[in-house]
Amino acid sequence: MFPTRLDSSLAYDIAKAMMDGFNRHYRLFRTESARAKHRFETADWHGQQRAQRDRIEFYDLRVRECFMRLAREFKADEQPMEVWQQVKLHYIGLLVDHHQPELAETFFNSVTTKILHHSYFQNDFIFVRPAVSTEYIENDESETSPTYRSYYPTHDSLAEVLVQMVLDFDLRCPFADLDSDAARVQAAMVEQLGEVKLRANFQLQVLSGLFFRNKGCYIVGKLINGFNEFPFALPVLYGRAGQLVIDAVLFGEDDLLMLFSFARAYFMVDMEIPSAYVQYLRSMMPRKPRNEIYNALGLAKQGKTLFYRDFLHHQRHSTDKFRIAPGIKGMVMLVFDLPSFPYVFKVIKDFYPPPKDTTREQIKAKYLLVKQHDRVGRMADTLEYSEVGFPRARFDDELIAELEKFAPSQLEISDRDGDGRIEVIIKHVYIERRMIPLNIYLQEAFDAGGANPDDTSPAALRAREQIERGVIEYGNALKDLVAANIFPGDMLWKNFGITRHGKVVFYDYDEIEYITDCNFRKVPQARNEEDEMSGEVWYRVGPKDVFPETFAPFLLGNPFVREVFMKHHAELLDAAFWQSHKERIQAGHVYDVFPYDQGKRFHPEISDAQVPSSI
């Protein structure tokens, strides 16, 4: 029975303690994000990387602190459900005029679900649905720190206004030639506008927070004229002389989607009202789910919450069944999907055939490494869930048999909540964006005649371009991973996927290593004919030894694939290439990475990146 009166002072005290816990969390999160500006101004790239890793751990630490306080001060796990119903209602009252209500609701869920039995995970006790609207919260924000600022240039004053817009961010380091950069941005904006009349509402809007990631920061906003809006971003980098430059102007949803890709590290942004940032960014990228925008802003737990709500909504409005995912089955992961839903679900198997030598804990550690690392646009982000329930009726019997065979410890089939509905409960699962596996992408092109030089049909020519594009992108992905100090371990085509933007992304993490932990060697010269003809490895191989020249037999069996690979990426088969980058990283060098095409850059001369394309 839902309470008609709030008469429990204990319930209020518990709610207040949880609100205090959330406010402490967001204060620390925001402080660390705001410090990114100083780290950028002092070119403290290693500090930026450390802060990125540390900030990811903040949420779980604060949840644990709050849970322990509730147990210690209020014996929270011993309180009756009547009290817990009132706790939620008091908490809702505390959210009135709060600037991060959606994050605070999620924090409440994270703490409460550590205390209550799963049968109480319903809207009476936790926030299954949001209770407080996030619309127009920014109407109450300080005039001195709005979510976004507006500028009203004329055709003649656009460059001058752009200069002022950049200076208003108060970066404490000089620009090499801001006037020249502003003139380039102006020219690009005029080209975007085309031959149109400037309307009464012609304006520039920019979000007040700078977006920091890697060695760059980004000014993000819109150019508005009449009924047209042009999303844009301005990357700000260090030039050769240690002075700042605007390196490009990115326009339109596709460029912004690349910048905010799920395969990139999270931004650091100082935000008073994160929902206002998400709403603004969503207006620029309407195809991007809100959960992925929260993730990109470093608010991963909110991203998980919204993803799960979207997933439940999709299940309610679809009828297809979960199935074993298409493609070559993995030795470590059992992968399944729902055809109508653009994600895959990955469960760690209970056992791994030779030559795999790993454990569940080691695999989880690899996935955590990727979560905390700079993914440079080449490693897919993952969402990690525990005790996830699916309707049994929606599971293909073949998939159930596969789970029972390879991951029985991770599977429970029961009426967990006692409501008469049988569920498939997965103890631990990773969820990733679905991509086309690169081996399937290439095979489709082979089947269309792309590797046959005698086939000159239009379909074969398109297929040949597909092969070339896939192989070049694969090599670029490997080089980008090198720049991020990542060695994939298993480099087979099947462990990489193609995104909707045509980028190759790595997604199989159980064998990854830091480049700096590997020893890259040439295969020794055979001592005699017997060694040369031997099918066995006759030389000593250490546990972290890598022989790049041995990649070729596994990757380059097709002559056309080999031709393209050797033309663009032959150095990947040379141990000296890998070893030289290892030594630079060990010496403290941090590579430049660019989430946009090299052709868009105003200052290509400042790059030390070894990749001649975007990442």
From Swiss-Prot:
<dbReference type="GO" id="GO:0006097">
    <property type="term" value="P:glyoxylate cycle"/>
</dbReference>
<dbReference type="InterPro" id="IPR010452">
    <property type="entry name" value="Isocitrate_DH_AceK"/>
</dbReference>
<dbReference type="GO" id="GO:0004721">
    <property type="term" value="F:phosphoprotein phosphatase activity"/>
</dbReference>
<keyword id="KW-0418">Kinase</keyword>
<keyword id="KW-0378">Hydrolase</keyword>
<comment type="similarity">
    <text>Belongs to the AceK family.</text>
</comment>
<dbReference type="GO" id="GO:0004674">
    <property type="term" value="F:protein serine/threonine kinase activity"/>
</dbReference>
<dbReference type="GO" id="GO:0006006">
    <property type="term" value="P:glucose metabolic process"/>
</dbReference>
<comment type="function">
    <text>Bifunctional enzyme which can phosphorylate or dephosphorylate isocitrate dehydrogenase (IDH) on a specific serine residue. This is a regulatory mechanism which enables bacteria to bypass the Krebs cycle via the glyoxylate shunt in response to the source of carbon. When bacteria are grown on glucose, IDH is fully active and unphosphorylated, but when grown on acetate or ethanol, the activity of IDH declines drastically concomitant with its phosphorylation.</text>
</comment>
<keyword id="KW-0963">Cytoplasm</keyword>
<dbReference type="Pfam" id="PF06315">
    <property type="entry name" value="AceK_kinase"/>
</dbReference>
<dbReference type="GO" id="GO:0005524">
    <property type="term" value="F:ATP binding"/>
</dbReference>
<dbReference type="InterPro" id="IPR046855">
    <property type="entry name" value="AceK_kinase"/>
</dbReference>
<feature type="binding site">
    <location>
        <position position="346"/>
    </location>
    <ligand>
        <name>ATP</name>
    </ligand>
</feature>
<dbReference type="Pfam" id="PF20423">
    <property type="entry name" value="AceK_regulatory"/>
</dbReference>
<dbReference type="GO" id="GO:0016208">
    <property type="term" value="F:AMP binding"/>
</dbReference>
<protein>
    <recommendedName>
        <fullName>Isocitrate dehydrogenase kinase/phosphatase</fullName>
        <ecNumber>2.7.11.5</ecNumber>
        <ecNumber>3.1.3.-</ecNumber>
    </recommendedName>
</protein>
<dbReference type="GO" id="GO:0005737">
    <property type="term" value="C:cytoplasm"/>
</dbReference>
<dbReference type="GO" id="GO:0006099">
    <property type="term" value="P:tricarboxylic acid cycle"/>
</dbReference>
<keyword id="KW-0904">Protein phosphatase</keyword>
<feature type="active site">
    <location>
        <position position="381"/>
    </location>
</feature>
<keyword id="KW-0329">Glyoxylate bypass</keyword>
<keyword id="KW-0723">Serine/threonine-protein kinase</keyword>
<keyword id="KW-0808">Transferase</keyword>
<dbReference type="GO" id="GO:0008772">
    <property type="term" value="F:[isocitrate dehydrogenase (NADP+)] kinase activity"/>
</dbReference>
<dbReference type="InterPro" id="IPR046854">
    <property type="entry name" value="AceK_regulatory"/>
</dbReference>
<keyword id="KW-0547">Nucleotide-binding</keyword>
<keyword id="KW-0067">ATP-binding</keyword>
<feature type="binding site">
    <location>
        <begin position="325"/>
        <end position="331"/>
    </location>
    <ligand>
        <name>ATP</name>
    </ligand>
</feature>
<keyword id="KW-0816">Tricarboxylic acid cycle</keyword>
